Amino acid sequence: MGYLLGVDIGTQGIKGVLLDETLKIVKKAYIEHNYIQPKANWFEHDAEETWWKGFKAIIQKLFTHNSFSPQEIIGIGCSGVSPCMLPVDSRDKPLRNAILYGIDTRAQKEISEITQRLGEKKLLEINKQPLTTQSVGPKILWYKKNEPE
């Protein structure tokens, strides 16, 4: 028999589930973690600790005390908090904490600047939707202005 593995890396925890081929839950696990809030309305994750180590820990929890092996996995589904912004170096190592999706509002000023510069009509033409705190572009501009290194 084959098994399906699902992992969801969320804002405050990681959920994992193993299903058999009939989609019956064989095992599930949860690991709680916290976001970092360095300032009001700023929300971050330490990607190395929260995402990568958390992912490995949830996999370990799912495969502990089971009568099957990882080789029996026939499908994997993974989801995570997004859109998040995580700058990395040339070796894909995080340069700082990840800025979380729309709950982090530090780029509000950049949203206004871009919208003013392009105009709402042109912005909708290009982007097909207005910029929000979910948008990555304003976060890139925020980095450029505030953490250029």
Please name every model-derived segment.
Residues M1-N97, E125:
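N-terminal glycine/serine-rich phosphate-binding loop of ATP-dependent small-molecule kinases
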Residues L86-L141, K145-N146:
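Glycine-rich phosphate-binding loop and adjoining helix at the ATP-binding site
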Residues Q60, T64, Q116, K145-E149:
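Generic secondary-structure signature for well-ordered alpha-helical cores
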